[in-house]
């Protein structure tokens, strides 16, 4: 086991503070509308230019192991805030630096760090409650666009596209961000339920020009096993042929004789039929088939529940107004399932989302929910160069998260004003002894975001803070236009969830760092010790000359 170096007390806290400052000072130059860019060197390809706090934070690794601990802990603040709220990473970093910097001064002066931490925690609880009081719900298109615009660094086109996407697919809908092949940023929406399985044979195509199979007023047979034997399918095919309606078969797979017979009957014009594989894998496949059945008012024909394919009847089939199938995707539009059944299924999926701890499972459940109730929108991000495309795509993703957060918990005045407005709540918070110092730390830290926005805009921060403090409600400083305005009317708003998460995560990590009394890191190895013994020992390799005899092996 390698030897360790240990630092105690103030020496350790100073090393952490140095690391915190290096990371925070690099990240905070990006804050606000007049925030600057950071250029990151990449080992391959062009350098990355970004104004995204978490992207900058992730790139920072320091040589000194103790300083690096401080940097990594603040990096955790940024990434945790990004995970929860999707934005506010720079604000969280600025707050963490301010809380730790103020707190470590008090600890150095001999105050009890545990009591200070308790005071910080109580002050943050009070501020979070106050933020929720001044929060304002957002509903209309214009407000959603404003949140998106601000989070995308004041890019109005991105804000408008996100608002349009949310309007089309609803609160539960899935919105994905992809790179476009052109220079324009566009929005594509998919109506109904779409899953990523295309037709099993190109002979099912009804529109050769678009290479698409379109089935109007169709029936849907849903089966959870492979179909390879035609005789199992015959009874239900005869019944659907009599009805004259087109049929879509969704099964684990359709192969051999069964697929060949379907294709032949399709080509002869006896049956208007198409077949696709079931989406997903394992348990998720079963769940998705149930979703399709619920949406279309059919049943999953499964031996697990006592249904055999050869005994299937017309009332087990789902129904939809229109189905389109291309080589990659199947889209079911206007399924004829009962509204009550669909809502019951939605409720069930929502409960699963609440319970699951896995981010991957949560994402997949969210997708299923969207397919049942909302729809799917794709924002295709276009730009002139790849460097710009990557930067723009990161901004769109940030803005999308922030907008979702705003719809969830409402908005507060932006530009650091909300934190200033909540300060008055701390005036009434009287705690015992040294806990009151924790309240003072939070009071000073809450000014840090607005100060940094003013600094980045090249304005005297103290004057800005003073003016905003003396104002009321949403009165604040608009750094983009260098004016004092009503932030809500000017559309300068932050999602409450972002402001709340940034403060909670910053105070949590800063509090832990304050109560740290010892740091342990591995002792760096000396270069000389590593290289000293090697060359001499290698001399014995001369004996390898005998390998010449290996030629005979060939």
UniProtKB/Swiss-Prot annotation:
One of its GO terms (biological process) is protein refolding. Disulfide bonds: none annotated. Keywords: ATP-binding, Chaperone, Cytoplasm, Isomerase, Nucleotide-binding. Belongs to the chaperonin (HSP60) family. Together with its co-chaperonin GroES, plays an essential role in assisting protein folding. The GroEL-GroES system forms a nano-cage that allows encapsulation of the non-native substrate proteins and provides a physical environment optimized to promote and accelerate protein folding. Forms a cylinder of 14 subunits composed of two heptameric rings stacked back-to-back. Interacts with the co-chaperonin GroES. NCBIfam families: GroEL, PRK00013.1, PRK12849.1, PRK12850.1, PRK12851.1. PANTHER family: 60 KDA HEAT SHOCK PROTEIN, MITOCHONDRIAL. This is Chaperonin GroEL. It comes from Pelobacter propionicus (strain DSM 2379 / NBRC 103807 / OttBd1).
């Amino acid at each position: 086991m390698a030897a360790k170096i240990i630092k105690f007390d103030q020496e350790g806290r100073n090393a952490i503070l140095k690391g915190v400052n290096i990371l925070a000072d690099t990240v905070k130059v990006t804050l606000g509308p007049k925030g600057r860019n950071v250029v990151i060197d990449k080992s391959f390809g062009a350098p990355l230019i970004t104004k995204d706090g978490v992207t900058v934070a992730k790139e920072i690794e320091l040589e000194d192991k103790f300083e690096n601990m401080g940097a990594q802990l603040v990096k955790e603040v940024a990434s945790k805030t990004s995970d929860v709220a999707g934005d506010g990473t720079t604000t969280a970093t600025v707050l963490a630096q301010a809380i730790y910097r103020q707190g470590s001064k008090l600890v150095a002066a001999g105050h009890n760090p545990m009591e200070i931490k308790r005071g910080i925690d109580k002050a943050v609880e009070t501020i979070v409650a106050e933020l929720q009081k001044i929060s304002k719900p957002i509903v209309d298109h214009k407000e959603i666009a404003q949140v998106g615009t601000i989070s995308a660094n004041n890019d109005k086109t991105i804000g408008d596209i996100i608002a349009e996407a949310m309007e089309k697919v609803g609160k539960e809908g899935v919105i994905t961000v992809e790179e476009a092949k052109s220079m324009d940023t566009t929005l594509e929406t998919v109506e109904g339920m779409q899953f990523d399985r295309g037709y099993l044979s190109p002979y099912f195509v009804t529109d050769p020009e678009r290479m698409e199979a379109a089935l109007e007023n169709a029936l849907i047979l849903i089966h959870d096993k492979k179909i390879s034997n035609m005789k199992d399918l015959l009874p239900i095919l005869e019944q659907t042929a009599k009805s004259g309606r087109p049929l879509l078969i969704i099964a684990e797979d359709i192969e051999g004789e069964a697929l060949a017979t379907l294709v032949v009957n399709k080509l002869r014009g006896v049956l208007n039929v198409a077949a696709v594989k079931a989406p997903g894998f394992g348990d998720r496949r079963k769940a998705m088939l149930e979703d399709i059945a619920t949406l279309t008012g059919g049943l999953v024909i499964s031996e697990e529940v006592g249904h055999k394919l050869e005994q299937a009847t017309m009332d087990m089939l789902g129904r939809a107004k229109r189905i389109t199938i291309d080589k990659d995707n199947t889209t079911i539009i206007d399924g004829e399932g009962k509204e009550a059944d669909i809502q019951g299924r939605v409720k069930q999926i929502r409960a699963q989302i609440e319970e699951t701890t896995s981010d991957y499972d949560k994402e997949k459940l969210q997708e299923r929910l969207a397919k049942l109730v909302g729809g799917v929108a794709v924002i295709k991000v276009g730009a002139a160069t790849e460097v710009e495309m990557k930067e723009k795509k990161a901004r769109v993703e940030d803005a999308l998260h922030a907008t979702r957060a705003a719809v969830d918990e409402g908005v507060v005045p932006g530009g650091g004003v909300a934190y200033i407005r909540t300060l008055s709540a701390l005036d009434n918070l009287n705690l015992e002894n040294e806990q009151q110092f924790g309240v003072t730390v939070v009071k000073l830290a809450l000014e840090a975001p607005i100060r940094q926005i003013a600094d980045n805009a090249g304005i005297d921060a103290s004057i800005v803070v003073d003016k905003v403090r003396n104002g009321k409600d949403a009165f604040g400083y608009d750094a983009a236009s260098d004016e004092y305005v009503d932030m809500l009317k000017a559309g300068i708003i932050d999602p409450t969830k972002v402001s709340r998460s940034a403060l909670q995560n910053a105070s949590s990590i800063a509090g832990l760092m304050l109560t740290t009394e010892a740091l342990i890191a591995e002792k760096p190895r000396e270069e000389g010790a590593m290289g000293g013994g090697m060359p001499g020992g290698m001399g014995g390799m001369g004996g390898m000359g005998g390998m010449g005899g290996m030629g005979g092996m060939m």
